[in-house]
């Protein structure tokens, strides 16, 4: 087989993996946005043709002003710019670094990971127990998330109001961790098309530095596999401790993504 044919095959496999990564991320965000809208957030959404666009003009954060699907369809960026302009927000677009215009500094750089769910070994921590959250525990779960991430008050409020809409859904798993009998950690995953997206993950400051994040990655991978998903996926800020945790847990780095402001692309 010619050398260039081998390279092409590998490139196609890498592209397929990143496309799968993009699909599960889009599905997970779609579900979170649906929960936020159910909680009363004024979030305008355009969803179709492999793209997902959101705009929350009155919300003081960019977390809902976002465009997904453009890593696979960069030629449609103009649709995102028009959507954000229509709703009066400076949204953000997730792109492959190769498609980011030169001279523009991304707002965020993210490492993407995906691997077989049964490949991640357990990572027990002395005194730590992890279990799936039921309806009665969702308030405790979200308080750990809020304290762990420490968002601005408006974001904390929407997270609290959204949380009841996350529990009791077969596609979503919420996990809470107790260290020596005290609640210390919380995490979640979203399941779609045979892949589990590892999303929220927070450890209270008093319990950090013990390997709890790594333990939660392993537990969510186990639960994902138990529910019929072949793979798990996640992303993390380039160079962040969370990226090191994903790599240390055995997840495979598959590439990078960048987040670009719409105003920088206009």
Which residues does each PLM region occupy?
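A conserved beta-strand-loop-helix scaffold within acyl/acetyltransferase catalytic domains
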Residues: 153-206
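Conserved beta-hairpin
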Residues: 44-49, 97-105, 124, 171-185
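Conserved hydrophobic beta-strand within the GNAT/NAT acetyltransferase core sheet
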Residues: 93, 198, 232-236
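Acyl-donor-binding surface of acyltransferase catalytic domains
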Residues: 70-136, 239-242, 258-262
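Conserved acetyl-CoA-binding loop-helix of GNAT-fold acetyltransferases
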Residues: 74-82, 203-205, 209-226, 244, ...
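Short amphipathic alpha-helix that is part of the acyltransferase structural core
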Residues: 1-28, 68-71, 75, 112, ...
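N-terminal charged segments
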Residues: 1-86, 92
């Amino acid at each position: 087989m010619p050398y260039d044919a081998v390279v092409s095959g590998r490139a196609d496999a890498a592209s397929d993996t990143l496309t799968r990564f993009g699909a599960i991320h889009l599905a997970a965000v779609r579900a979170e946005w649906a929960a936020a809208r159910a909680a009363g957030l004024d979030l305008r959404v355009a969803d179709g043709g492999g793209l997902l666009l959101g705009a929350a003009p009155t919300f003081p954060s960019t977390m809902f002003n976002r465009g997904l699907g453009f890593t696979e369809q960069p030629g449609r960026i103009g649709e995102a710019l028009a959507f954000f302009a229509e709703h009066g927000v400076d949204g953000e677009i997730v792109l492959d670094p190769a498609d980011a215009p030169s001279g523009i500094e991304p707002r965020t750089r993210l490492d993407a990971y995906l691997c077989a769910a049964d490949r991640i070994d357990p990572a027990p921590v002395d005194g730590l127990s992890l279990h799936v959250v039921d309806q009665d525990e969702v308030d405790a779960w979200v308080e750990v998330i809020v304290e762990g991430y420490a968002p601005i008050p408006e974001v904390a409020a929407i997270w609290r109001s959204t949380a009841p809409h996350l529990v009791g859904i077969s596609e979503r798993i919420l996990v809470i961790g107790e260290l020596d009998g005290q609640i210390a950690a919380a995490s979640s995953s979203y399941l779609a098309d045979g892949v589990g997206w590892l999303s929220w993950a927070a450890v209270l400051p008093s319990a950090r530095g013990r390997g709890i994040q790594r333990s939660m990655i392993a537990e969510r991978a186990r639960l994902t596999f138990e529910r019929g998903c072949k793979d798990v996926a996640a992303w993390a800020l380039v160079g962040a401790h969370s990226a090191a945790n994903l790599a240390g847990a055995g997840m495979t780095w598959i590439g990078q993504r960048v987040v670009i402001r719409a105003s920088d692309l206009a």
